[in-house]
Amino acid sequence: MYKTIFTLFAFCFAPLSFAQSCENNANALVARYTVDTHNARGEQQKLLELWRNEGVVAHRYPQTQITEAWELVNASLIKPTRYFDAHARAIEYQPGEKVHGKSETNWSFRNQLFSDELIATMTETSRTGSGCNTLITFEREDNGTRLTLIWQPALKLATSFTAESTHQSVHWTLTNTEFDKQQIEQFFAERYAYQSTDFADIGDDHTDPFLTRMVHQGFIEKAASGYYNSDGDALQGGHQH
């Protein structure tokens, strides 16, 4: 009798524990992507890493040694920080302060790379697997570009994304995912230890060689339309070269 009762309790609570495990994994992970672009200029591959740790998310671009991070202060405030990994330096922004010409308000875009709003505009075409391993394929036609997203909802993670048009194809591939909490905390701790400067104070300090060089090269420029595009390419003075 006791064995039967225990079995029933285990059966009732197992799905809840399973769901909690999925959620815990989604909140602390590192996902690594390759981004392959093919167009008239040829083929190019870049790398992108997505790091999450309980309300903080970072995009690391190995090719430029830049890490962009965002902290969810509350439901409506997001605090951005840009880390220059090669120099162990950081530029901090206040919540609500404009970065790339606008204030950060869309947490799902930063946390997932593909926002809830974008996914909501796409059509589900197939679904495979179950539980944490469920994969959903979404598609959308957008001004001559066909978008295909393979989505893992339990982890809020893209496993594949393709944007194809007559002029260009871009393909994102998830190469690996890790859930090593110690590794993740070390990644963020290393960057928290960088020498940090508030963005509002950059123009007041003319003695810092790093800041002077970055401003001169256009890596840090107030009112620029952006410093790095979504692939992590440096933008000189707000314009792509």
Regions found by a protein language model. Name each.
Residues 58-65, 79-83, 129-195:
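Gly/Pro-enriched, hydrophobic low-complexity segments
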Residues 4-13:
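Sec-dependent N-terminal signal peptides
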Residues 16-55, 193-229, 238-241:
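N-terminal leader/targeting segments and the immediate start of mature chains
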Residues 44-114, 170:
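An acidic-aromatic
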Residues 87-149:
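Surface-exposed, polar helix/loop patches in the mature regions of secreted/periplasmic/lumenal proteins
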Residues 106-115, 183-204:
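Short, surface-exposed secondary-structure junctions/capping segments
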